[in-house]
Amino acid sequence: MSNTFSKNNVKKIKQISLSLATNEDVLSWSNGVVSKPETINYKTYKPEKDGLFDEIIFGPVTDFKCPICFTKYKKSDENTICKRTTSCEKIQPKILPKISRRSRMGHIALNNPVVHFWFFKINHSTISKLLGLKVAGSNKPVTKSDLEKIIYYKSHIVLETGGLKSLQKNTIIDINDAADIYAGALEEILEFNKDNKDGYEEILDTLNDLKEYAASKTGQDYGIDFYEYNEIIEEYSQAKIGTGSKAIEYLLKNIDLEKESKEIQDEIDTINDQNKYEISSSEALKRNKLYKRLAIIKSFLKSGQKPENLLIYNLPVIPADLRPLVQLDGGRHSTSDINELYRRIIIRNNRLEKWYESDAPVLIKQNEFRMLQEAVDALIDNSRKKPGPVTSKDGHPFKSISDALVGKKGRFRQNLLGKRVDYSGRSVIVVGPHLKMYQVGIPRDMAAKLFEPWIINRIMKEEEGINSVKAAKKLVDSLNPIIWPYVEQVLENRPVLLNRAPTLHRLSIQAFQPVLIRGKAIKIHPLVTTAFNADFDGDQMAVHVPISKAAVREAQELMLASKNILGPKDGEPIINPSQDIILGLYYLTIEKANQKNEGKFYPSFNEMMLAYENKYINLATRVVLPVSALKKISILQKTDAPYIYSTVGKFILNNAFPRDFDFVFGKRVTEKLTSTNEHGEEVVSLKTKIDTSEHDIKRYVFNYGDNFTAKIKEADVNLPLNKKEIAKIVRNIYEKYVPIVNIEDISQVINKIDKTQLDNLHELCSELKDFNGNKLEDNRIHLELLVRLIKEEFLKIQDQYFAKDEESIFNHKYWELKHYTKLLERVWFRYSNYVSTVLDVIKDLGFKFSTKSGITISMNDIVTSKTTKERIKKAEEETEALKDYFKKGYLTDDERYTLTIKKWSDVKESIEKELKKVVDSNLDNPLFMMLSSGARGTYSNFTQLAGMRGLMNNNTKILKADAENDRVVRSIVEIPVKSSFLDGLTAYEFYSSTHGARKGLTDTALNTAKSGYLTRRLVEVAQGVVIREEDCGSDYGFVVKDIKDTKTNTIIESLQERIEGRFTAVPIYDQNGKLIVKESELITPEIASEIVAKGITKVEIRSVLSCHTRNGLCKKCYGKDLATNRIVNIGEAVGVIAAQSIGEPGTQLTMRTFHTGGVAGGEDITGGFGRLIELIDAYDQPWGTPAEISRHYGKVKKIETQKNKKGKESGQFNISVEYFDEDGNKQTHQYLVKSSQRLRVKQGDEVVAGQKLSEGPIVLNELLESVDTRAVQNYILKEVQKLYRLQGIAIADKYIEIIIRQMLSKISIIDPGDSSFYSGSLVDAFVYQKENGILLSQGKKPAYGVVKIKGAKQTPLLSDSWLAAASYQETAKILVDASIAKRTDNLEGLKENIIIGYKIPAGTNSNFEENGKYNLKEFSSYFPNKYDSTPELKLEEITDENIEEEFDYLKENTISEEEFENLDDDTMYHLETSDEFEDESFGEDDFEYSEE
C-alpha cells in the first residue's frame, strides 16, 4: 500500500551516478573564465571583473540587478538579457536572482594540464595501478613514488625508445643516473648520424660537454640538466623522453585497456593453476596486486570513460556563495580558505602565461608547472599534501575542498545526514508525578515560542481588532496574558517529540501530549525515565514540534510514550516502576501476623478504609471482606465462596487494578531448600510464587460459619512484592490490555451507531475479530472494555452537541461526520492507551504509600555481623602462612599472589553471605526494606557498609604481551581494605581505594564513547535492512539448540528463549510422531514450552541468516517484532533496531577487567567490550593466544611435547590429527600449540572441522577456511550472546543474526567464468546468485567465488550505495572508486534517501499491508459516507498546481529592498508572506530554546 499523505506527481530522482568530469563537462558548467586573482574592490566592496567573485560569471549580488549598468529589474524579467548600454549589449549579462550565486560556476583555463591529486595519491594511486608500468626488458615495476617524481618534474621517463638500445621503454631516469643513460643514447645516435655532417658535429659537441660536465664537481653534486640533451635526442632520433603531466597524458592516451585486461587475467589464471591447494605469501601478494589493477582497468572498460579524464585542463571554480567573503566590523574581511587556494592557482597560472609569452628557459617554465600542480593539489586536498599542507600566515593549514567533505564536521555528516531543526527548544527536566504517561509539562513561554505560527493564526481568526501578523506576533513575543487560551487550543491534539541525548535507541525519542506549566523546566513522567535513561540531576531534553498532518499522525500512533511499553531489545516492559514507587508498593503489600484487630470482617471496601483511616487496623492487618463487595469479575468467575481475606494494603492495591484483572494475594513461600556449601555451612534457599485469583483462590476464601480469626492465624504470612514481582505484574497488565482489535474494525462499529443503536452495541462488538482472526466474544476483557468506552464517549458527545432543549442553537438533529470522527478519535485514544492508564494508577499508589510510610535511614540501621572480625583475623593468619611458604621456596611469588587474592575474595564472599542472613531476619529495618524491595542498593553495597570493603584495583596496565605469555598481571592490590564504611577507613585504606574509584569513572567515560562509535558502525552495517515482503519462500532453515558454555557446561541461552516468536522451517513432531506445530507457523510461548517439555533438543526455524529477500528481510524469516509482541510489519526498519539493541547495552559491558585477579589467560581475557569489538570487526589477531582449530574431520592420533634440534623441550605440544583426504587416503596433520595453553582434546578423541584443540578465541577467517558459513554464523552468535548474557543483558538472537548476515554478505570471485565479474572482485551474495542463475539457464559457465567475512568497519564501505559508503568513512577513496567505475546509486537504503532529502523507504513510506501499523489514515477517512456540513478543501484536492499558483501569487507581489526601506508601519503587514521579508527573530541563532 502507498501512503495517503504522499504527494502525487512530484518528479523523483530515481538514481544518482558519479563519473569523471570531462573537459567538455567543465566548460558546459562554466559561465566564464576567472583570470584575475582579485576578489572585491577594497574601496567600493564591489566584486572585481574577471575575479573570483565576478558578478557576470557567478551572478548578481543584488536580486535582478544588471552587474554592468546596475539597472534593477522585476522578478518577471528573470533570465532575460540586459541591453541598456553598449557595454551591456556587448557582454550580454543575464538578469538573475542573487541565489544564483550559490549554483553558477566558473573555470580557470590552465596553461598546462594538471594531474588530479586524488587519482595519484589516494588508495595507493589509481594512475599507478592503471598504467602498471614496468621497465621494458626487465620485470622491474615502476612504483607509485617513482610516478610522483615524474608528476612533480623531478625525474624523466622514456616514452618511446626510437630503436635506441641504451633506452628502455618506461624507464624512469633519475637525475643521478642521467649522465650514463644519456651518454649511451648520444653515442648510439652518433653512430646513426655519421653521414649527416652538421648533425654529427652538434651531437659530438653535446656528448663531450656531457662527459666533461658529468665529471666535474657540480655535475657530481647536483646531477646533470636534462633538457638540452632531450632536445638533441628528439631532434636526431625517434626517441621520446618526457616529464610532468604531459608525460602522464601521453601514457594515459596510449594505454590499450583491453590488451592489459587480458594479460592480467592470464597472469592470475597462471598463478591460480600453479597454486591450487596452497599459495605462498609472495604469490598471494602478487595476485592481490593483479586483482587491484584488474579492478581499475575493468572499471574504465565498463564505464567507457577515457583515462585522460584523470587530468585537469580547465579547473572548475565553485559558486561564489559557497566560499563567501564576509565583511566584519571595522572594515576587515574574513574569507573562506578556498578563495586563498584559488588565488594561488590563478597567480601561478598567469605567471606561467607570461613565461610562455616571453619564451623563458625550459627550467623556469618547468618550475612553474610544478608550482601550478602543487597549487591545484592544495585546493583539492590540502591535508594529504606532502611534504606538508599549505598554511596561512598564522600557520594553520587551509581547509581544502576534500576537508569540507570528510569527518564529523564535513558536508555529509554535518549538513546532509544531520540538520538543525527549527521549532525546537531545550530545557532542564524535572519530575512530574501527577502527569499521565502520554503527557509532558512544557513551560508556558517555551510553548508560546514553539507554536508561534499556529497561535498567531488563532489570534487573527478570533481576537477582535487584531488583523495583522505583526500585531499578533507582538502579543506572543511579549507573552501578553491574552494569548494563553489560544495556546491551550493550539496544543490540543498536537503532540511534541522529546529527545534526550545520547540517542542510543529508538525510545530516546518519544511523543507526548503537551500540558502547559509555569516555570522554566520541562516536566517528565517518572515511568518513562528508564527508556530515556534520564534522571533529574540536571539532565536536559530537547523538544521538537511535528508540523505536517502526516508527522502528527505518526507521532500520535507510533511514537506516543504510552504505546511504547516494551523495549525492542528483549521484548520486556521498559516502563517498569522503580525506586520510590517500588518502595511504596512493597510497604503497601507487607503482611504481618498477630496485628491488632486481625481477622475482623468489614461489609464493604469503604468501611474497611474508614477503619484504616481511624487507625483501627493498619496496612499489614489481614481482614475479611465479602466477595461481592470487591466487584472483581476475576474472583467471581473462580469461586462461589462468600468471603475473602487479604491485608488492607493488598485490598487497596487490587482495588486500583481493573475489575477483570486477577486479584494479587502476594508472594508465598512454596518450599524451603537447605543445602551445605563447600565450607560445610548450611544454606537455606526459598522457592516462592505469586498467588493470584487465577490459580490460588481456594487458600484465601472462607465459607459461611467459618471462624475467620482462627483460620487466619493458621495461615502462612505472605511476603511483600518486590521489584521483580511488580515487573511480572506489569508484563501481565500489558499482555491483558494491549489493543487486539484494529482501528479499522472499531470504526465499522461506530459507523453503525446513531441515537438508537446503542442497545445492540454488545452484539456489534462481539462480531469483531482480533489480530489472530478470533471473534471478540471469546475475549470478554476486550469486549467489555470496548463496549464501555464506546458507550461513555458516545454519551459525552450526546451531552455536548445534542442539547435536551429542542430550541437550542447547539442542537444537532443528526450525527455528522465530525461527531463520528470525534467519537472514533476518543475511543481509539482511550483503548490504545489503556495499559498506560493502569500503570499510572500503580505509579500514584506507589508514590502515595512511599510518602505515607515515612521510611528514613540512619547510622543505627546498619546492622553488623559478629563474625566479620574473626573471619578477617583468620584470613590474615593464612596469608602470613602463604608468605612463609614462599620464603621457604614451596611457592613461586606468582602462586603466592594468586592464592592471597583468592583467599581475600573468599573471605569477602563469606561475609556477604553472613550479612545476607542478617538482612533476611530484620525485614522491618528501613535500610533492608530498600534493599529487599529492589528500590535501591545491592547486597554488595551493604557488605561495604557493614562488613569489609575488600580488594581494590591497582593501576597496572594489562598488555597484550601479558595475555599472550600468560603472565600473572597484578591488577589487584593484595592487601584488601579490611574496614567497612561504618568503621571508617584508615589513611592507607582510603588511599588504596581512591584508585579503584577513579578507574571506575574513567572506564565508564571511555566505554560510553566506544559504545557510541560501535552503535554508529552497526547502524551503518545494517541500515538498509527493512522488512520488505510477506514470505521469501526460503526452504533452508537454521537449526537451533541451547547455547551452552562448553567449558563450564552451563546453559547461556535456552532453546525455549531462542525459538519463541520465530517461524518453523519444518513441521515439528514429538517422539511418538505426533505433530506439535506445522511448517511456517509462529512458535508462541505456549508452543515453545510444549516443545521443550516433550524433550526436543533441536528445532529448525526460519532465520534471518537464510532469508532470500534482497536488500531486506521477509516477515516469516524475522518472526515476531519484540516491541509490539506481534508478527513484524512490512516496512519495519529492523536493521537499525538490531544495531541499536546491540549497541545500546554496550556501555554496560565491562571493559577488559580481570575478575579474581587470577591467572591471566583463559576465559578472563575474552570477556567484555573488547571481545565484542573483536568479533564484530572480525579481527585477525584477537587478544591473547588464539585457539588452534582442527582443519579436518578426523581423530587425535597422539599428543606429544615438541622437542628442538638439541632434543630439549621447546615449550610446545604437537597434536597429530589423522584424516582421510578427497581420494580416501589417510593423511596426518600436525598442529603446534603452546604448552601454556589448555588443551580441549585428548588422545583418541574424534574431532570435527572447526573444533577447538586448545583454549582461546578463534580467528574467524581461519574458521571460515575450514568450515561452512553456518558454523561461523553459529560461532559468532554464541560468542556475542555469551558476552551479553554473562552481564545479565538479554538480547534477541535475530538482532545478532542481522549483523552476522551483513558481515557474510560478500563473495570474492576466484574464477569469473562467463559472468560480468572479474577475478578478485567482491560482489554481493544476491548479485552473485542472480548472475549465476542466468548463466546456468543459458548453459554458460557460472562464476566461482568464496564467501568472505568482513568486519563492521569494512562492511559499510562495500555497500552497493556509494552515497552511504562515502558518508561513513574514507570518503575520498570511495568517491575515487565510484567515479572511475561510473557507479550508480539506486537509493535503496535509508541513508541515501536522507542525504538527498527524501523520506526513507521504511515505515509509513514503505509498501505496507492494508491493516499494518503503518497504515495511518485521517480519522475522518474511516467514514466516507457520512454527511459533512463543513466542506473543506480535501487533502487529495491539494495538487501541486494549487501550490504553484499560491507561490506565483506570492512572488509577483514582492517588492524591492529600496521600496521596503521607505514603507510605513501600516503597509508592513501585507509583506508577511513575501519571501523578501525575512523575519530575523525566528532565526536559528536567536531562537531562545534552540538546539545547543
From Swiss-Prot:
Annotated Acidic residues bias:
1474-1492
Q: Which residues form a coiled coil?
A: none
Which one of the record's GO molecular function terms can you name? magnesium ion binding
Q: A single GO CC term, please?
A: DNA-directed RNA polymerase complex
Top EC class of this enzyme: transferase
Give the SMART domains listed for this entry.
RPOLA_N (SM00663)
Can you tell me which residues bind Zn(2+)?
1032, 1107, 1114, 1117
State the UniProt keywords alphabetically: DNA-directed RNA polymerase, Magnesium, Metal-binding, Nucleotidyltransferase, Transcription, Transferase, Zinc
Per its Swiss-Prot or TrEMBL entry, what cofactor is needed?
A: Mg(2+); Zn(2+)
Q: Quote the record's binding site residues for Mg(2+).
A: 535, 537, 539
- Any GO BP: DNA-templated transcription
What the protein does comes down to:
DNA-dependent RNA polymerase catalyzes the transcription of DNA into RNA using the four ribonucleoside triphosphates as substrates.
**What family is this protein classified in?**
Belongs to the RNA polymerase beta' chain family.
Instruction: Write down what this protein is called.
Output: DNA-directed RNA polymerase subunit beta'
